[in-house]
Regions:
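Enzymes that bind and transform nitrogen-containing heteroaromatic metabolites
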Residues: 1-161
Length: 161
């Protein structure tokens, strides 16, 4: 199963100077992310995967084919289609769950190919230099669940299929 996982502000804000605009403000969102990705393969761009660890497997999507230590594979999505990348990952990697973790262009490119989307909406505006377009990411999707965070009413956790 391929999924996308993202959190964004009211206007799609997801990044500022290489970090989350709300970095450190929402521990429950961080816990949700880590819980979902703990036993999954993370797939994302260099800016989206901040830390490489043998305990947190990942594949990079990058035109720079240099493979960081503790990264399983690097895919150049300028040369390979989303379908080719997903098929190769499916063939090579035994993880049942594979999660797209960013960046913006990769979220948009994979939106119609993923089986499920985990979206954390933050009911607040943020300064940002990176925004996602939720109309692309959620096109032709149905919301299957929604819940407010226990600790902060600004957070809403949604699941889309």
């Amino acid at each position: 199963m391929f999924c996308s996982m993202l959190a964004c502000g009211q206007n799609g804000e997801i990044g500022l100077n290489g970090e989350l605009p709300w970095e450190g403000q929402y521990p429950e969102d961080r816990e949700f992310y880590e819980g979902q990705t703990e036993l999954a393969l993370r797939i994302g761009t260099r800016g989206a995967i901040a830390h490489f660890s043998p305990n947190r497997p990942c594949c990079l999507i990058s035109a720079n084919v240099q493979k960081p230590k503790d990264c399983i594979y690097v895919y150049n999505w300028k040369k390979l289609s989303v379908e080719q990348i997903f098929a190769d990952i499916e063939e090579r990697v035994e993880f049942q769950k594979k999660i797209i973790v960013g960046g913006v262009k990769w979220y948009h490119a994979t939106a119609s190919f993923v089986d499920r989307i985990y979206l954390t909406r933050i009911a607040k505006n943020f300064d940002s230099d990176r925004k996602v377009d939720l109309s692309i990411i959620l096109a032709n999707r149905k919301k299957i669940s929604s819940r407010s965070a226990r600790s902060n009413t600004e957070l809403i956790f949604e699941t889309w299929e």
